[in-house]
Amino acid sequence: MKLTYHGHSVVKIETNGKTIFIDPFITGNPLTDLKAEDVHVDVILLTHGHNDHVGDTVSLAKKNDALVIAPYELATYLSWKGVRIHPMHIGGSFTFDFGKVKLTQAFHGSSYVEENETIVYTGMPSGILFHAEGKTIYHAGDTALFSDMKLIGEMNDIDVAFLPIGDNFTMGPKDAAIAAKWLKAKMVVPIHYNTFPVIQQDPQQFVSMIEGIGRVLRIGESIEL
């Protein structure tokens, strides 16, 4: 399994012959190394409906005939835009041919702002547990610290956890460090920081708080499990 960080909350997973993107915010993302027109994707996983997470989902899904997996309301909304969907909800899991997906809770919001400035409610936000090739990945999405992260850590042997550290909209570094302790992941990668002025953080400072399990991935850098 190969994991690549593409800035903000964008994570690419390559496993079992499939290319999977989590929260493909590419167009308008000042940090990413990608161009949407060059991206190949088989599956898109979405944590919630905010524009900086849905990103290029519709155009990528249509171009690649990619399956979009998302919380029910968000998936339904995207189906009206002509994409293939698999709706899920918090606590539910499903085994696909490329791996097993389970949605966890997240403490955040979920809505999509249309070009005409209409705000569309898109259900509850989520985190994602992804299991494949004997490995477990946890992408927390956008979230505050919440005590059931302890339960997520107890129920899952997490190899890599992607945690937001930007503060303001999500956990900041101190809360994310507590989350890392509770999750008991073998490796913790900070995400959702430095994309915009309001979420400026020093990821190395965060890594120094979590006792040797943290790793800062440069934009476009990969790890193999």
Swiss-Prot record:
Pfam families: Lactamase_B_2 (PF12706). The keyword Hydrolase applies. Keywords: Hydrolase. SMART domains: Lactamase_B. It comes from the Bacteria. Transmembrane segments: none annotated. This is UPF0173 metal-dependent hydrolase Aflv_0488. It comes from Anoxybacillus flavithermus (strain DSM 21510 / WK1).
